[in-house]
């Protein structure tokens, strides 16, 4: 009896651009041999809106409201780096109080980013319930943002050259502390439900392994890099804002797989809580002071009229001209390094404005780590990268 030859030609399958697990309008052209992934070609650009060219035709204050539409899970990070670039180029100082307020907003955004990663990632691997839990906590962060900026998810439009748009309202720091007290036990709850769940562990351990040298050579950043054994965090490396004032640790793992990336993000949320608590206690002007009221009551000789107690160094005029020169500035977002290359031409608009998105770089390694895995593992590996197509395509 002759044996039938069952081997077939490789099959090309399209995932996306409209697929629930694509995390936006991403299209993957996957070549399969049975259930094994032979090749993968990401097709991007469906959400390209020309953000860099828009920036080159707007003043800085005009462009800030645009940036949270790139990565709607990291709007504060993009606002921060967009104002940091002209600040450093023009050597504009930032008051200590404004720097602390910025750190508070950035760390809240880091937690919100990781929560919005955690829920869909677990849904991708088959756990639907945590998706509802994470929005319970995010709702409290939205409330804090709304109290300080007037907006909840995107278009906070809060960062300004030299500081922030407005001081924190009275009682905001107490509400932020309440959130920290509430959210700490919730992380423990997530760990009990997820981390040692045998089904979850067997589903993602050993998937999408990236070695230390690979991670560096592919220019990965953020949790993708730190999960591969490289404790590189720009908050420690570049010493920007006032992060050196706080006691916190860099979260990192050695395994380099999907589970390690999950562990890094969980630990980063704990470290963000440590920073938030310290910032609430150490902010210049006191933790419960209404600085503006004290300044007005005590007159111009009040200590609260000093530079470090301001929320903005000097309101930049609409005719503020970006000086000649070029500069690259960067910061650590929830997804990794986001950076701005700015080239000034002594004009109100920049001559060149290049945006480096963290998830855009991290996505490039996807075809490399997918090869040899099963088709069912595509969603888990892609989900562990944490991409938002608005910032990938820009």
UniProtKB/Swiss-Prot annotation:
Keywords: Membrane, NAD, NADP, Plastoquinone, Quinone, Thylakoid, Translocase, Transport. It catalyses: a plastoquinone + NADH + (n+1) H(+)(in) = a plastoquinol + NAD(+) + n H(+)(out); a plastoquinone + NADPH + (n+1) H(+)(in) = a plastoquinol + NADP(+) + n H(+)(out). Its EC number is 7.1.1.-. It comes from the Bacteria. It is an enzyme of class 7 (translocase). It is found in: Cellular thylakoid membrane. GO terms for cellular component: plasma membrane-derived thylakoid membrane. GO terms for molecular function: NAD binding; oxidoreductase activity, acting on NAD(P)H, quinone or similar compound as acceptor; quinone binding. It is a peripheral membrane protein. Pfam families: Complex1_49kDa. Its main location: membrane. One of its GO terms (biological process) is photosynthesis, light reaction. NDH-1 can be composed of about 15 different subunits; different subcomplexes with different compositions have been identified which probably have different functions. Belongs to the complex I 49 kDa subunit family. NDH-1 shuttles electrons from an unknown electron donor, via FMN and iron-sulfur (Fe-S) centers, to quinones in the respiratory and/or the photosynthetic chain. The immediate electron acceptor for the enzyme in this species is believed to be plastoquinone. Couples the redox reaction to proton translocation, and thus conserves the redox energy in a proton gradient. Cyanobacterial NDH-1 also plays a role in inorganic carbon-concentration. This is NAD(P)H-quinone oxidoreductase subunit H. It comes from Synechococcus sp. (strain WH7803).
